[in-house]
Amino acid sequence: MRIRKRFLIKEIKKIDKDVDSNLLMGKPLSDYLAKLRNILANYKKLVNIRSKIQTKTDPNELKEELEVRRKQIMEDAQEYLRLLNQKRIFENAREYLTDLNTFKQILHYQKVDRIKKAKDNVNWANLLEVFNIWIVDIPNVDRILPMEPELFDLVVVDESSQVNLAQIIPVFYRAKRICVVGDHKQLSLESTGLGFEISNKLDSYTWEKYKPANLKYEEAKEKRITLTKASILDFLRENNFGIPEVMLDEHFRSVPSLARFTNREFYENKLSIMTEKPEYELYKSFKHIETGGRRYGSSKVVIEEVEKVFEIIRSLLSSRSYQDVQLPDYVPEEFTVGIVCFTREQSEYIRIRLFEEGIGERVYVGTPEELQGHEFDVVIISMALDKASNRSKNHYENKNRFNVATSRAKYFTFLVYGGLPENFDLTKRYIAHFSEEKPNVVLEEDNLHFSRFNFESELEEFVYERCLLPLKESFKREYGVEIEIYNQYKTCGYRLDFVLYNKNNKKFVALEVDGPHHFEGDGLHSYADWHVERIEKLKRAGWNIINTPYYKWYLEGWLDQDHPTVKGELERIRKELEHYLL
């Protein structure tokens, strides 16, 4: 037996030199065989991988194949998890059918005593085995779920700026961990008046009656723990609990020109605008209309604005256009319209008119407080404002309210107002943001633009002259398409070396010229981590990217056009451009 062991150890060490012979001698023979099988299997895999790598003379080709494989792995993994989840649900549903039927009764019962009795009869551990992710609005949490500690591994609270402490503490009781999501630069609980609709006097009276922690009401307000004055987001942000905070800095909702205003005005340009693409920058996204008219008496309704709002709606719904505005093709056929009113009276007046005229479908109306958290394809902001309303500045130009009102639209915003008071500086900046742009197109002069002065390296200029210009001419000659080339295009917080845009079909692709600093200094032409992260972020925003590395164009000097490496790279880029642009 020992001779056989020594023989096996000797064979193992031929493959794995780090094996400890003395350690193996003391183990059963089965351990040798298992070890040998594992080593041989791994060795065969490595040999297979090495042979595949050796057949790839071009690292860029290998990178592309790895990208395809990785994408396929992600798709397979997602499908596997989906099927695994379905399998778990079906298997557990059969086993816990009684609990499912009882829970179904909870959803239909109206009487509190019947709901409580049904909840007591549910084995919640079984039910959570069937459904492990729940989406519930806060008022229904107590109605549906039992008051059991740590019922969920994680509870996520969205729109937390509108959730008060009394509402959320029972929810947190059911959680092992919590995640609070909200925007402190949008409307807070105090502004919206949501939650428990009680007066400040009742809030103060109740607090002083019970006086938790012996705190006076005014002290409690300062600590942001009163019912009507503070949300869970306010409470966590304004008390130093050492809870980590992460900013979600990628904006996916609005087209670039709309997003740039809110980014600059309210977020100090800290957001990456993930919608910055040529197709969204070739069209108008904003129109302001001064209707004249005024409020009458104590009314906060401007009739002239209301009539203009309905004129716009009828025209959009019938022809997808209004005056010089034509909704682009990327706006959905069944587009939604949100009417944002700065006064409740104007909102209610328009709501009644919508009902009377039967225009309710796909059209929604509300104040910024009511529409926070919602988005619409097209937004009409009706300000109910005249030139004499200068005393209303604090309401209209409250930054949080203005942020919500101006960030509901995905594709287009109409701003309708009777008149603009002299002291409305924020509103004037809002209008000026768009009037700086050209009349017929929405573009930044330095974005949809090409200039040789923008080249940041000789390599960029070389690739433009030897590759992009000839291909542009070739595409026009062979396919009859006009390809626009932009350089140093700003998107997602980065600048792209080149963007190629097919004006015929609105398709586009980025071409990145990767110099030596884009690679690790290992001699293997491996991309640096920061560059990989950059590419991943751009792809997350929907960009198709062609990378061309410096060593395809330069090798101790610029390579000639007839050099095999250059010819191969030109052919590769041409094929990718045909794929993405035609």
Task: Please state what every model-predicted region is.
Residues 195-246, 354, 388-486, 557-582:
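Helicase C-terminal subdomain and adjacent C-terminal extension
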Residues 4-151:
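Conserved helicase NTPase catalytic core signature
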Residues 265-352:
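Conserved helicase/translocase motor-coupling segment
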Residues 112-266:
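ASCE P-loop NTPase helicase motor core
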Residues 315-407, 412, 416-425, 429-445:
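Conserved helicase C-terminal RecA-like lobe
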Residues 131, 225, 298-312, 343-346, ...:
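Phosphate/oxyanion-binding active-site loops and adjacent basic polyanion-contact surfaces
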Residues 495-533, 550-555:
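Short beta-strand-loop-alpha-helix junction that forms the active-site gateway
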Residues 166-209, 260, 272-307, 417-418, ...:
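Metal-dependent catalytic core segments for phosphate chemistry
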